[in-house]
């Protein structure tokens, strides 16, 4: 596991998370540690964020990474396109910042046969917020429009 990685202790069906010093636990259960605080304003719904991430399992093994793919991810906030806890973590970051976030099952992905996830579990991500763009809808024709995002 990476340095400063949380420990997950299973107690029956419950999981207790033990974090090294420097982590913050929010009221809704989201846990994070900022390794670097970025600059600028916090991103808001409707804005486009570009970021890199590493997703880990509870043992600290990498399960997905934009670094491995060589291309950062981009999405607009507030369109239900991400795991709720991941989006919440992004909204608390500034461009240039890096953060490790521990997402509780309640803020994690939906589970069930139609999803990739068969059971509720804790998710751990390292996130690097690269940039935030403002977006606006522009008319492209009589009945059509598109969303344009600019720095």
Region spans (language model):
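Cross-family detector of peptidyl-prolyl cis-trans isomerase
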Residues: 1-151
């Amino acid at each position: 596991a990476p340095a400063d990685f949380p420990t997950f202790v299973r107690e029956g069906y419950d999981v207790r998370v033990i974090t090294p010093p420097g982590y913050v636990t929010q009221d809704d259960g989201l846990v994070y540690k900022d390794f670097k605080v970025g600059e600028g304003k916090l991103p808001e719904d409707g804005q486009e964020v570009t970021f890199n991430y590493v997703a880990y399992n509870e043992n600290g093994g990498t399960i997905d990474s934009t670094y491995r793919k060589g291309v950062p991810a981009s999405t607009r906030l507030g369109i239900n396109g991400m795991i709720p806890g991941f989006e919440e973590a992004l909204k608390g970051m500034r461009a240039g910042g890096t953060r490790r976030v521990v997402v509780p099952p309640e803020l994690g992905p939906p589970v069930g046969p139609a999803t990739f996830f068969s059971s509720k579990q804790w998710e751990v991500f390292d996130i690097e917020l690269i940039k935030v763009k403002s977006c606006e809808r522009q008319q492209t024709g009589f009945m059509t429009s598109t969303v344009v995002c600019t720095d």
